């Protein structure tokens, strides 16, 4: 019964209160900062795309060029197995298998092949133009072919090239020119044949000591065949060596040869340039569209970063090696502590956030004779929202120099360069990834500090208004020394609290209670004092009862003196 009286006493003593706090929810989102790991926040935004659809798709409505079982060389030279590629429309990117079967059917090499593929990565359409028609080589045989490039079981040759051999027993000097009047730059490919022995040389070209000369305003190349015995490839001991150049507008290319010339019948006008690329993959085009393509699959996202593949084509996020990039946009999420104790106190911002406040990030909880409730502080919440709205864009702007992995290729003789290039690219990507991760950590630290600062500013705003008309309870709450109805509470919230109006009432109520001061003593200390007093009183009553009983039965003599 005494405890009930004590609780009622404490309840009666408790004054009106206003608390400053912040929003919390059931979110389990976690972010990292410079100083902390796995900080639970109310709101966060994942800015790293980790998924793709596993498909090769049209890019912005334009299909890629599927080389199927052909290589770039097989396509450009016109391998008979690649006839489907003789005429191709505009492409968005090129799909080439890792090891296509149909390349140089007649064995040999392609000079600066990797550089050519790099050039093609910036082209989205070739227009094939006949530059040196085969029927104009009237003094030479133009039907040269090989079983290595068989077509329907018979010997054939690259469709876009002309293998010039002797006519009868003569091979007069072959001289032809082409002037580029197409209005665009043009890719020109030619070759030289290296026979297996001198008898093959005479059988094909009659002449020995031959040469092939090619010249433009910027090129002067003269080559001679290297006659040597070699192991047979595709049944051939000879080799063909192909070269290429870009012929500028109005420039002229001149060919001159006394034998062994593989002449171009067609050139490739670069009719459209764009951000293309060569995807090394075994995949095939599927019925889908995307704005961003990788060799592994298409990415459809609005996020600023991805970790899928360094080689991308289209409007793509920036590539990083990170496994996780989460940007904090909300506050630290500390669920409200529902520990009401003897007073039914509402936890303030020190103890935890409020799930009951749903219309803002920061705000108030008040309790008085008219009731209690939450109210968000619209002004501070809106300022915070404005400050964080463009945070993702800010991160992107700070990382606006994308490191591009262009998928360079190297020949077998350039392995050291390839390894060095790979190490450099890996190093750049490591630095790029570190910068992105560090930027996110710093932004998260700033965001959480920003929210903490806003809560503190709101607290200070209330404290400066109330001054000594209320006492700070140490948990984000103030207890008034005067009665504060709803109108009074609203004036505190909107910053129009009239200190002088309540000053006298507060002075009267600030008189400290002598003995036990509730303002600085905990519940357990109060209960301990109560228990001590109650125990002493019970002991005194017990001793008095025993004494009266002993006096009544004669065990104790009692004398009352007046």
From Swiss-Prot:
Marked site (Cleavage) residue numbers: 340-341
Stretches of the chain found on the membrane's Extracellular side: 16-525
Annotated keywords: Clathrin- and caveolin-independent endocytosis of virus by host, Clathrin-mediated endocytosis of virus by host, Disulfide bond, Fusion of virus membrane with host endosomal membrane, Fusion of virus membrane with host membrane, Glycoprotein, Hemagglutinin, Host cell membrane, Host membrane, Host-virus interaction, Lipoprotein, Membrane, Palmitate, Signal, Transmembrane, Transmembrane helix, Viral attachment to host cell, Viral envelope protein, Viral penetration into host cytoplasm, Virion, Virus endocytosis by host, Virus entry into host cell
Membrane topology category: Single-pass type I membrane protein
Cystine pairs: 19-477, 57-288, 70-82, 105-149, 292-316, 484-488
Chief location category: virion
Family the UniProt entry places it in: Belongs to the influenza viruses hemagglutinin family.
Protein name as catalogued: Hemagglutinin
Source organism of this protein record: Influenza A virus (strain A/Herring gull/DE/677/1988 H2N8)
């Amino acid at each position: 019964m005494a405890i009930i009286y004590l609780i009622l006493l404490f309840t009666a003593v408790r004054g009106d209160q206003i608390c400053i706090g912040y929003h919390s929810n059931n979110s389990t989102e976690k972010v990292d900062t410079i100083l902390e790991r796995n900080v639970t926040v109310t709101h966060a935004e994942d800015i790293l795309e980790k998924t793709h659809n596993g498909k090769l798709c049209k890019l912005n409505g334009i299909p890629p060029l599927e080389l199927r079982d052909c290589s770039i060389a097989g396509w450009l030279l016109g391998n008979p197995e690649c006839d489907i590629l003789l005429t191709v429309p505009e492409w968005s990117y090129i799909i080439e298998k890792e090891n296509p079967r149909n390349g140089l059917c007649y064995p040999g090499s392609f000079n600066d092949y990797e550089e050519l593929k790099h050039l093609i990565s910036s082209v989205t359409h070739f227009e094939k133009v006949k530059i040196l028609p085969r029927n104009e080589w009237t003094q030479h045989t133009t039907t040269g072919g090989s079983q290595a490039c068989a077509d329907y079981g018979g010997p054939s040759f690259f469709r876009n090239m002309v293998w010039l051999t002797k006519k009868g027993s003569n091979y007069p000097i072959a001289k032809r020119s082409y002037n580029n009047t197409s209005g665009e730059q043009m890719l020109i490919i030619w070759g030289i044949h290296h026979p297996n022995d001198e008898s093959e040389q005479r059988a094909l070209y009659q002449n020995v000591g031959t040469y092939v000369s090619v010249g433009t305003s910027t090129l002067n190349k003269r080559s001679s065949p290297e006659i040597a015995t070699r192991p047979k490839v595709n049944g051939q001991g000879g080799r063909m060596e192909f070269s290429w150049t870009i012929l500028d507008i109005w420039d002229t290319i001149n060919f001159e040869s006394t034998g062994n010339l593989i002449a171009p019948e067609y050139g490739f006008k670069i009719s459209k340039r764009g951000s293309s690329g060569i995807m090394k993959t075994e995949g095939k085009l599927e019925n889908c569209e995307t704005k961003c393509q990788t060799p592994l699959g298409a990415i459809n996202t609005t996020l600023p970063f991805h970790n899928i593949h360094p080689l991308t084509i289209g409007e793509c996020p920036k590539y990083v090696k990170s496994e996780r990039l989460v940007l904090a946009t909300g506050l630290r999420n500390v669920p409200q502590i529902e520990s009401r104790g003897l007073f039914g106190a509402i936890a303030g911002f020190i103890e935890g956030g409020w799930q009951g406040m749903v219309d803002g990030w920061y705000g108030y909880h008040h309790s008085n004779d008219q009731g209690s409730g939450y109210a968000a502080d619209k002004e501070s919440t809106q300022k915070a929202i404005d400050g964080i709205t463009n945070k993702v864009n800010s991160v992107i702007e700070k990382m606006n120099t994308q490191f591009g992995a262009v998928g360079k290729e190297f020949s077998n003789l350039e392995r050291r360069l390839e390894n060095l290039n790979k190490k450099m690219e890996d190093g750049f990507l490591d630095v790029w990834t570190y910068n992105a991760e560090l930027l996110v950590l710093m932004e998260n630290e700033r965001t959480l500090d920003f929210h903490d600062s806003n809560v503190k500013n709101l607290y200070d705003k209330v404290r400066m208004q109330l001054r000594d008309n209320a006492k700070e309870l140490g948990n984000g709450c103030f207890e008034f020394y005067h009665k504060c109805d709803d109108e009074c509470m609203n004036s505190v919230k909107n910053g129009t609290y009239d200190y002088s109006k309540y000053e006298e009432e507060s002075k009267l109520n600030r008189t400290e209670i002598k003995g036990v001061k509730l303002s600085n003593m905990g519940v357990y200390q109060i209960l301990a004092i109560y228990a001590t007093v109650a125990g002493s009183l019970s002991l005194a009553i017990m001793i008095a009862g025993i004494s009266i009983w002993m006096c009544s039965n004669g065990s104790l003599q009692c004398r009352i003196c007046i």
